[in-house]
Design a protein with these regions (language model features):
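Hydrophobic beta-strand segments within extracellular beta-sandwich modules
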Residues: 1, 95-97, 180, 184
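Short loop/turn motifs at secondary-structure boundaries
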Residues: 53, 82, 91, 103-104, ...
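Short, compositionally biased serine/threonine- and acidic-rich segments at solvent-exposed termini, linkers
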Residues: 4-121, 126, 130, 140-141
């Protein structure tokens, strides 16, 4: 936009202002990559969630990003919006990715994502800490036709769970099992997959 002003002496001045178009960001699950860093040597089972933006797939705008842990409604580990679409050191859970135009030109765009995390151990001793073996980030909203099977070292099924269950308490037929290695098989069928 160019504006011209003229005063009483016939002097004029031109000023050019650039207006950048801004659209509501378009965010799709295909833009999100969840990387499990647990397989790396020396890792402490940290997760990293990143948003890959290819060739301005979000639309026109100058965007910033935030992530909200829906389990406790905190923007973890960040206090607010940031310019980098990368979030690291997350635990398993359901997260809301939020994108907005940094100039406030459009409302937030949001997307819920599931970040799966399997615990390496649990301590079912009723102290309130790690008393249940729970798969974090799995629920019926994301995985409606899913199940979890837990086996002892000899292959005997000791527990069968749904993803929304409280978790496994380390018992079989009401009796506490010994401290040992147990194996699990989890079948996660996403909600958008039809049989």
């Amino acid at each position: 936009v160019t504006a011209t002003t003229t005063n009483g002496t016939m002097c004029s001045r031109k000023e050019t202002i650039t207006i950048n178009e801004s659209n509501i960001a378009t965010l799709d699950i295909s833009f999100v990559t969840i990387v499990d860093e647990a397989s790396n040597i020396g890792s402490q089972n940290n997760l990293s969630i990143s948003i890959d933006i290819l060739s301005n797939d979000l639309g026109l705008g100058d965007y910033q990003f935030a992530i909200l842990n829906t389990d406790d409604n905190t923007r973890t580990p960040f206090a607010g919006f940031q310019y980098q679409p990368l979030f690291e050191n997350l635990e398993g859970g359901i997260y809301k990715i939020m994108i907005n135009d940094k100039n406030g030109c459009s409302p937030d765009t949001t997307l819920l994502v599931s970040v799966i995390q399997f615990p390496k151990f649990f301590t079912p001793n009723s102290d309130g800490e790690n008393d249940y073996w729970v798969v974090k980030g799995a629920n019926k909203t994301f995985y409606p036709n899913s199940s979890i099977h837990i086996f002892n070292r000899y292959g005997k099924l000791v527990a069968q769970l749904e993803v929304d269950d409280q978790g496994w308490d380390g018992t079989y037929n009401g009796k506490t099992l010994s401290s040992d290695d147990y194996w699990f098989n989890i079948t996660l069928i996403p909600a958008d997959i039809t049989k």
